[in-house]
Amino acid sequence: MREVRAAAFVFFWALFASAAAPIASAPQAVPEGPRPSGAGNLYVVRYDRWTAQDERGFGEFITAIGESQCHTVNDCLHGGDNPFRASDPPGVHFESDCADLPYVLRAYYAWKRGLPFSYEHDVEPRGHTRDIRYTKNGNEVTARTDVLSFSPSGYTLLDAVRDAISSASYRIHPDLQEPLEPDLYSPAIEAKSIHPGTIIYDPNGHVATIYRVDPDGRISYIDAHPDNSVTRGFYDERFVRSRPGMGAGFKNWRPIGLVGATRRADGVYVGGHVELAPNDRIADYSDEQFFGTGKRPRDDGDWARGGFSLNGEAMDYYDFVRAKLAGDKLEFDPVKEVRDMVDSNCNDLHYRADAVALAIATGIQNQPEPERLPPNIYGTEGDWEIYSTPSRDARLKTAFKELRDKAERFVRMYEAGDPKLVYAGHDLVSDLIGTYDREAADCRVTYVRTNGSHVTLGYEEARLRLFDMSFDPYHCVERRWAAADPSELSTCRDGPTKQAWYAAERNLRNQIDRTYDAEMDFTLAELGTPGPGKGVAVPPDVDARRYLMSVRGLRPKNQRHVPLATARP
């Protein structure tokens, strides 16, 4: 591997000004099937750039993993849907958390295909910060590593990437290209630009990779967690927008090329260095996701004033994204939406069950409760990062809230006769209740109590317990699942101190906003007093069914029972 420091970096325009086509779309033939990776496990570069076909192949690789339903990074790369699995010995173990996963998958694919690869291995904060992962003004790239032929083994590369990358690596202003270019750029919100392989960065410290975009514009993603589990979900308001310096949102891999290398007779490129395309040489670079579709404000501080519109109609950002990815058309099939959201929430409950079971298996619940919470319960290190679930739980609660809010939105659209609603029935509310009940009835999640007995919760029971489920890894499994009935809770071995912590953490459980900038290293006594960073007293409404029951019988205004839109065949 070749290290590049900021002071030594020089961009060679010849790569992009040469007679060859731009590296983002060079019409280079690619052989069928996996490319050879060279002798042994060494990284061997056989192609000097990524072509459009390579990018499509990478997207197909990501889609296959996303659709495979693998549950750990190791399972994904050893699984039958990885076309390169036969080249990896059975004893090789793959790991990744959320920030590492996009890089691990990209580096792995580049290695197996013989493609050039380079990565930012050092970022520094722009201004003072307590934690570089949550800097107010973002970070800048100060050092890069080029991966050249025969420099590392592919497995060594994956380890090096995991050591170098954190969520801080994504927290970069879309305009910033100094001291060094970042690996990623901000793409236009277009169907051709947001695709499998595109990364989504949540500035609250989470990263996901898109594996599918449906015809109606709905985005499906995969993500990983500190326990190396892999989960799936739909893009929604859990991925928040924020000031441009934080670099939130969609990111694509910057076009790269190998320059100055010697091509041997066997086709292997030796030496050289990797160069990255600057923003102004990337056809679909755009900052609209930060500033809106109108004129960019002079000051980044005014970013939130930027609005989004399509075909003359003002839109919410998330609607805008969906409409653009659906061919500039925004439509909702409310029955399908509710069905999919209940199903997704059920999957998230199962993912949580796996995470809690993994924590319990380590015995951490038998350790004494520390005297203080971590400096921040959402962004920390060590056992708390691996085995606690405050971030996961907050995202789960947000998803339940979004289902409730979407249900109300669909009802209001139905009542108003909104043509964006694709519904061919005669009683939307009843159909939504029926769909909700059917999907909820099929959802069961089971946990193992301290004495080895099993408790199974239905979807509605889990929803009722949602804000009582402990995120604290030092609590018994019964409290992790909000057991309240004396018979269910009887096997919990938590003493008075842990019981007091559970009670004191209630307001933190009520909070769905992940406040990574808050100081939260409270003692038990401090947590019990009012003050910032201690949560909220009342949780949000997440009961979609109760809302739907409250509006039963509602009909569209000025209509009898005419469908609001023609259903698709």
Label each PLM-derived region with a short phrase:
Residues 22-167, 174-177, 266-569:
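Mixed-charge, low-complexity intrinsically disordered regions
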Residues 181-189:
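Active-site neighborhood of thiol-dependent amide/isopeptide-bond enzymes
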Residues 188-196, 200:
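Short, well-ordered loop/turn sites that connect or cap secondary structure elements
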Residues 148-182, 226-273:
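A recognition module on extended beta-rich or small alphabeta surfaces enriched in W/G with H and D/E
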